[in-house]
Amino acid sequence: SVFQSLPDSWAIKQIFPIMPIHRLLERPTREGILSDITCDCDGKIEQFVDLHDVRHTLPLHDLHDNEEYYLGAFLVGAYQETLGDLHNLLGDTNVVSITIDPVDGHFEFVKEIEGDSVGDVLSYVEYDPKLLRDSFKRKAERAVREHLITPAERREIMEAFEKGINGYTYFER
């Protein structure tokens, strides 16, 4: 979420360096803006740092089927995360800090922080994931007793529930 991770981009029109972080040896062939899932129309970034000025689009590559495409937003720190807090209840994103060796250009992951799970965000707003899990399990067991679902379906449903509540709040493949 732009609101969550880059609040100054919409609040004071701060421009952060943003670029693809792979396929760096390929020339981008597309132009685009960034837009996210928000409750209003401000969740977009339409200004990007260029070598000499500001661009209104971001150079991007064609997407390939079944291939992830990642962008990095740089010079984002704890201040942005603190301001973003829990807007839209999407939680914190995964964050990585890197250093780049100025001599050979190689990079090193200095610190990796995993973003919030659905259970984390639910607990922030006073819902107990364990109580939700127990309640859901009781309902699934009752559905088996009442012959609404089979024991195998109950197991699949509970596995999906666990995967969901322990999963990341943002879309994952």
What positions do the PLM features span?
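Charged (often Lys/Glu-rich) extended helix/loop segments that serve as interaction or gating elements
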Residues: S1-R173
